[in-house]
């Protein structure tokens, strides 16, 4: 292998590692933490959005209701809340991984009807 090819190969590996690093950070929480977060989703989120997430004080959070909404926007809403509404920000109690997990669960259609 020539020096140039070796350098390009190493650069490619470094770039791939850099691009995949955020995916490692976004790994799902441990199983015990997931159970805690699922409970929080049903009890805390469900107290405003309905136990089946079909709406109540807050809007519906069903898979259909969230269809087309950008994941990043949903994460920002859970993180910072919605000023002027009853929706609080959860960043004081939950970290980024927890919030991403909750949003992903809702996008997957949790809780199942």
Curated annotation (Swiss-Prot):
A GO-annotated cellular component: periplasmic space
Keywords: Electron transport, Heme, Iron, Metal-binding, Periplasm, Signal, Transport
Protein localization: Periplasm
Alphabetized GO MF terms: electron transfer activity; heme binding; metal ion binding
Signal sequence coordinates: 1-26
Positions of transmembrane segments: none
Binding residues for heme c: 45, 48-49
One Pfam entry name: Cytochrome_CBB3
Record PTM: Binds 1 heme c group covalently per subunit.
PROSITE patterns: CYTC
UniProt keyword annotation of Magnesium present: no
Primary role: Monoheme c-type cytochrome.
Protein name from the UniProt record: Cytochrome c55X
